[in-house]
Amino acid sequence: MKQKIVLATGNKGKVKEMADVLSDFGFEVIAQTDLGIESPEETGLTFVENALLKARYASEKSGLPAIADDSGLVVSALNGAPGLYSARYAGEEGNDAKNREKLLAELAHIAQEQRQAKFVSCIVFLQHPTDPSPIIAEGECCGVIGFEEKGENGFGYDSLFFSPEQGCTFAELETAEKKKISHRAKALSVLKSKL
């Protein structure tokens, strides 16, 4: 019998990307939104702090073990922005399209060789809300921010994030391929090795 866990995210893209993999780990994944759990305010200063906040909150509200991911895009030329604010880069009412638009505007006068970026994912697993020894797994993918959007797949900044390893943006990859090589896939692989 699979262990029930709550996936502490309201982001449908993350649920889609993570649920299948976690199911393969032997978990029965329940999205927090399916339990009527809202996301807590993200007050951490790092990805790991925010992932812990989300996991503790979801575990407390659900009574189940929890897995949370906090991730974002870190652009060197912008001193790490959008970083922790990747989902809200264009403001609280922003969306993926507005976030990408703002990023392109911020980088408009930045040369190609200075557009390095990385996607970072920090995943936390807690047995219960007061678990003193959470499992923490991190993964990252390095790339470059393009000058225009390319590709139809993915979500967030995928259409701007060019992966030299893949020779295309994340949005040009098939979903199944991205699931194998993304920052989140790398963090999930680390998590699996620690479970």
Curated annotation (Swiss-Prot):
GO terms for cellular component: cytoplasm; cytosol. Its cofactor is Mg(2+). It holds the Pfam family Ham1p_like. Binds 1 Mg(2+) ion per subunit. It catalyses: XTP + H2O = XMP + diphosphate + H(+); dITP + H2O = dIMP + diphosphate + H(+); ITP + H2O = IMP + diphosphate + H(+). Substrate binds at residues 9-14, 71, 155-158, 178, 183-184. Gene3D superfamilies: 3.90.950.10. SUPFAM superfamilies: ITPase-like. The active site is at residue 70. Its EC number is 3.6.1.66. InterPro entries: dITP/XTP_pyrophosphatase, ITPase-like_fam, RdgB/HAM1. The keyword Nucleotide-binding applies. The keyword Magnesium applies. One of its GO terms (molecular function) is dITP diphosphatase activity. Transmembrane segments: none annotated. Keywords: Hydrolase, Magnesium, Metal-binding, Nucleotide metabolism, Nucleotide-binding. Mg(2+) binds at residues 41, 70. GO terms for biological process: nucleoside triphosphate catabolic process; nucleotide metabolic process; purine nucleoside triphosphate catabolic process. Belongs to the HAM1 NTPase family. HAMAP family: Non_canon_purine_NTPase. Pyrophosphatase that catalyzes the hydrolysis of nucleoside triphosphates to their monophosphate derivatives, with a high preference for the non-canonical purine nucleotides XTP (xanthosine triphosphate), dITP (deoxyinosine triphosphate) and ITP. Seems to function as a house-cleaning enzyme that removes non-canonical purine nucleotides from the nucleotide pool, thus preventing their incorporation into DNA/RNA and avoiding chromosomal lesions. Homodimer. This is dITP/XTP pyrophosphatase. It comes from Haemophilus influenzae (strain ATCC 51907 / DSM 11121 / KW20 / Rd).
